[in-house]
Amino acid sequence: MKTILAIETSCDETAVAIVNSDKQVLANEILSQVEHKKCGGVIPEIASRAHMKHLSGLIKSAMEKSNLNFCDLDAIAATSGPGLIGGLIIGTMMAKAIAHVTQKPFIAVNHLEAHALVVRLLYEVEFPFLVLLISGGHCQFLIAQDVGKYIKLGETLDDSLGEAFDKVAKTLGLSYPGGPLIEELAKKGDGMRFKLPRAMIKRSGCDLSFSGIKTAVKNLAREFVMSEQDVCDMCASFQECISDILLDRVRNAIGIAVSLNIKINDFVITGGVAANNFLKERLKKHIDLNVLSPPSNLCTDNAVMVGWTGIERLQRSYVDSLDFAPRPKWELEKYY
């Protein structure tokens, strides 16, 4: 059995977890930085300072809760990209320091791969499988062929989906982060009321675009003073629009997999926006694959997914040098 200490500091969550190869989570510590809420978005400098302030304490807490000593660990893993460079440096340097002192292997984890692989901690998912990764910073379709081996089928050409949710929420006078609020208000709204553009729909490929939808909401919001019901209707219409676009793109992704003679049984929806139950249920209803998603606490950024990815990589002897430099941009299909 292998056991890994994992660190996640790529954005505004400071997180530490201890995970083993028996699929046990021995500790899961996470601190979300509430300072960003009043700023309406993530401020990199604030995020970096918070990581520096809290990371050591979270590591200490995780070790105490797991009843382990550093000598009991088999490796140290950290998210080393993509993400905000300040946070990546802090988390990666801490992991390297622990690895050096304890003489344990260091594993640099790609944040996107961690989102893609965490379902294998929870379910029996075999390679290859289709991935829709939707988060605050990324939106892309992938075929996961193996650990470290991915085919990117398409991605957003402008805003990420999480960014679109947050900007629409801001337009409607809602607080940050906007995703959970939009989903909640949409339950009381009429999703057919406002006609929003379905960008890229019916086109070939799997690329996406959300800037036009964001602009359409802004233009409609300028036309009249919105009541509470108007806001609910707009939230519902926005979600309907997004679900139509994703459904169209998923069908194209399945078609591409077939054309490549890659047999897909599982479709994984992951990333922070995958916490949106409306979108997941809509896709499950219309896609003839085994549709899986992590629970909400493992959709948003966390160290459990980093630890599990570290386990997957350690089992294949994929370890990294202490000279490894954090990568603010690090595409999955260019993993090595």
Curated annotation (Swiss-Prot):
It is found in: Cytoplasm. Binds 1 Fe(2+) ion per subunit. SUPFAM superfamilies: Actin-like ATPase domain. GO terms for molecular function: iron ion binding; N(6)-L-threonylcarbamoyladenine synthase activity. Its main location: cytoplasm. Fe cation binds at residues 111, 115, 301. Substrate binds at residues 133-137, 166, 179, 276. It is an enzyme of class 2 (transferase). It catalyses: L-threonylcarbamoyladenylate + adenosine(37) in tRNA = N(6)-L-threonylcarbamoyladenosine(37) in tRNA + AMP + H(+). One of its GO terms (biological process) is tRNA threonylcarbamoyladenosine modification. Its cofactor is Fe(2+). Its EC number is 2.3.1.234. The keyword Glycoprotein does not apply. HAMAP family: TsaD. Required for the formation of a threonylcarbamoyl group on adenosine at position 37 (t(6)A37) in tRNAs that read codons beginning with adenine. Is involved in the transfer of the threonylcarbamoyl moiety of threonylcarbamoyl-AMP (TC-AMP) to the N6 group of A37, together with TsaE and TsaB. TsaD likely plays a direct catalytic role in this reaction. PANTHER family: TRNA N6-ADENOSINE THREONYLCARBAMOYLTRANSFERASE, TRNA N6-ADENOSINE THREONYLCARBAMOYLTRANSFERASE, MITOCHONDRIAL. Belongs to the KAE1 / TsaD family. This is tRNA N6-adenosine threonylcarbamoyltransferase. It comes from Wolbachia pipientis subsp. Culex pipiens (strain wPip).
